[in-house]
Regions:
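Acidic, Ser/Thr/Pro
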Residues: 1-79
Length: 79
């Protein structure tokens, strides 16, 4: 499995993703990342996007993982 981008926060976090093609973009906390990697159903912020850039905002302390499925290469930044 490829390296999954993540960011740690003690409050609010935003991510901006630039896609080349339509893709599923998920921002998940540590618990839901573990569920995702073990094939269980998981809760996420995001969804299927056909337009770029994608912006997702979350609030909550901890580590957040960015998962991009399909769409080929992408660029991202947490802020």
């Amino acid at each position: 499995m490829a390296q999954i981008p993540y960011a740690d926060t003690d409050g609010n976090l935003s991510v901006e993703v630039h896609l080349k093609h339509a893709a599923d973009v998920f921002l998940v906390d540590s618990l839901n990342y573990q569920k995702y990697t073990s094939g269980q159903s998981f809760k996420y912020f995001g969804g299927h996007y056909t337009k770029t850039p994608v912006r997702i905002n979350v609030s909550g302390a901890g580590r957040w993982y960015l998962i991009v499925v399909g769409g080929g290469q992408y660029q991202y930044r947490f802020y």
